[in-house]
């Protein structure tokens, strides 16, 4: 690995994993997936400008620009850990079932008001995204914010072994990826792997004191330095959303109102988490609040969109049982008129799937009779257990719903689109 690290430094810290986006002079890692093998494209990567290719097998006549390793993914991860060890930079690790990407962006926004930061781009939070983020660390960064996702036990432990966080937070724990985790307790154990590392290193956790699950997880780890936050804990008021003020507003105990560009009361926890981190790193409160108020979400996460015909709340990047119910509760609490729901099937819920979809259907039917459901049939199957869903419309795909909307346009509605990226609900705003 020392030789590989020397080559990495020689290339100025540039790495890539996709021949469609080769960075000239970089180290190319020939990763493998279900439907591809990067080893097949290693020679092409060099031809397109990569300086070296890390491979598991070398082509005939290969020169010294090919670096052979037993496992390219492990090599990438080991390289990231070695690189991280060269820096004393504080690292904020963030995980959780819901809200981790928004929280990560808010934490980056407030810390950037004082520091030069490195932050996970988009949702590159998996076994590949985490090492790629860490390999971007350089002497100019004063703090790093690393988002960590997981769908199976041990994946957070793997991420923290590379990132070596000095502090961190778990946004929440909910019922998601149950096929991989096995149960809700499996979710808690896996997310808790971040706490396990920080407990072993006497690190700091920022935790939601309003969450009984989070508090239980924190209490079990006695060496943690604990910094609480939470709307109830802090005496914060979440002001109701309405047609005139559709975005989240938070009234602090001293009377100051934070006016965000986020949709949904559930985002209050994410805002308070970011402010908690900001205080720990001694960011001026006015600067931190200004950063939060300036932040605008993207990537179909809690976005408010006004079209010529309707008002849309687009939260179509990620969905699970917990986040779906939370979004519906928030939508129900608003005074928007003519509400419509477009929901996508939830996946990776295992044996809990039918019950989870029935739970969502019952809550959705109590909000509006105008209900459109998209996906492979999870909602359709659950509707057999929910008589009040008899008027719902089911579509196999977002494309099928888009075609139907072309001849049955909606007008003067407030429409919540909630689903996972795989549901492709993001194609619908153009026709709404």
Enumerate the language-model features and the residues they cover:
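Peripheral docking tails and interdomain loops at the edges
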Residues: 394, 412-430
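ATP-dependent carboxylate/acyl-activation modules
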Residues: 94, 299-301, 422, 426-427
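Residue-level signal for inorganic ion chemistry
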Residues: 26, 45, 79, 94, ...
